[in-house]
């Protein structure tokens, strides 16, 4: 199944970019995400083509996107020669049991930075969810982690590599009570 989307949209960068901030299970965005994509994330005009692969044992989706580099992102800048951010995202979703799922994703992004060269970002996301069928409104557990690696080229002799990650757990202990914890580590994607 192919799906074409044209317009302004939140890009499929890892797990949290396509989700509006008020729907996230934490108060502030992870530092690694903000350092690479900004407070607003990657939200640009462009085109997206997604393909739901014909696999029977698990869900797999492949997404390609080209968008105008107009977001206020620390990693990308709308340059004179290159105006687009190119993104590829592979999402795999496995049903482990009636109560548990695992989602694994890979993302690659390339686009212009403020020195008229390119920044390349690779990301990996992993999410485990457990929600027992018989107690699904009262009990659940989620573990989600995302890892980012950036290579920003500023000239033929100057490149800056950086790394960031976050991991959080959320344990639902009652119908409307959740215990959540998160760890962040973030380097800056630029050289100052």
Question: What annotation goes with each model-predicted range?
Answer:
Residues 16-21, 74-76, 116, 157:
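Outer-membrane beta-barrel and related beta-rich outer-membrane complex signature
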Residues 33-35, 48, 76, 92, ...:
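Residue-level detector of functional hotspots within protein domains
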Residues 79:
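Conformationally flexible catalytic loops at phosphate/diphosphate-handling active centers
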Residues 99-191:
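Detector for outer-membrane/organellar transmembrane beta-barrel domains
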């Amino acid at each position: 199944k192919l799906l074409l989307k044209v317009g302004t949209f939140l890009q499929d960068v890892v797990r949290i970019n396509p989700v509006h901030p008020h729907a996230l299970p934490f108060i502030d965005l992870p530092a690694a995400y903000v350092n690479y994509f900004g407070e607003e994330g990657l939200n640009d005009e462009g085109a997206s083509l997604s393909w739901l692969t014909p696999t029977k044992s698990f869900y797999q989706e492949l997404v390609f996107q080209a968008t105008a580099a107009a977001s206020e992102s620390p990693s990308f800048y709308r340059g004179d020669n290159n105006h687009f951010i190119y993104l590829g995202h592979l999402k795999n979703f496995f049903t482990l049991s009636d109560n548990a799922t695992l989602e694994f994703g890979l993302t690659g992004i390339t686009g212009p930075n403020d020195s008229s060269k390119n920044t390349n970002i690779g990301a990996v996301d992993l999410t485990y969810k457990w929600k027992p069928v018989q107690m699904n409104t009262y009990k659940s557990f989620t573990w989600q982690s995302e890892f980012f690696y950036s290579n920003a080229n500023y000239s033929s002799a100057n490149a800056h590599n950086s790394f960031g990650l976050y991991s959080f757990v959320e344990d639902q202990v009652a119908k409307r009570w959740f215990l959540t914890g998160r760890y962040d580590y973030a380097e800056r994607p630029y050289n100052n």
